[in-house]
Amino acid sequence: KRVEKKDRIGAAERAAVEAAAGGPMAVDAYGRTRITSLYLDTPERSMIARSVEKPLYKEKLRLRAYGDAAGVALVGAFGAGPIVREPGGLPLSDGGVETRVASGLQVPGAAAALPVFFGIKKKFKGIVYKRRLALTLPAALAFVSGLPYEQACARWPLSDAALAAAALSPATRQIAREVEAAMDRWLPLVPSVGIACDRVAWAYRPEMLEEREDDELFDSELRITFDDCLEYLDCHRCRSPWRPIIESSESVMEIKSAGPYPPWLVEVLSAERIYPASFTKYGNAYQLAEAEPRARNH
């Protein structure tokens, strides 16, 4: 539960924010990371069409992978032919799952056991709530296609024993029920858009957290992320290429907070005239994808 604000900014604005953050914060241990997300939606993209109208409540279903190999595997597996979750439909067979996973791997077996994250992102009155599951790519394919969550995890477990056990804990099963209910609210469900970016995330330095440990007004969970090389893939188009969402010199800055911004952040945002703006990666990719046929016909 937190407030997330995204802004599309230029190189100079990004440099100013990073310079201001460089005292109390630092780039996290992951450094620059390739992130690939795949959004599920109805064939008409009803979920995102409703979302861009800015209702009080909206939700998105998203699969996510971290790293180049896992991202390629995710998009390749879900894009290797039609996959539809529909009322009364049968889940993919074991052979169907294995074939799809193999088609998405650059190196056979390289990413099959790496976790992908599948969840629901809800937004109500500006507050974001996220519920997500960690599971293998084969298990994610099977679960999305209709296999019960527990069966999918048991058939294709995570390689880490502790993570595999956590995936079947009562708390995680409850999250799975919520994700499953969200999927079933939007049937039929298909892969809609893939989105990839390079991310750098900033978080407070450990010494800053220790120093402000007793400060009730200090938001220790504050994070600032910068996404660049942002591009999308239209899953509705066979062999569609990746296309840019923003200019190469731009970044999407996201500030994730559970409380008020610290003075240094307010100061740099004001100095650079960076004001809250409505920007969603899936929303912008959707609008670009929908405009593409019309552009080609003129």
Model-derived features: where do they sit?
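Phosphate-end processing signature that detects enzymes handling 5′-triphosphorylated RNA
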Residues: 1-298
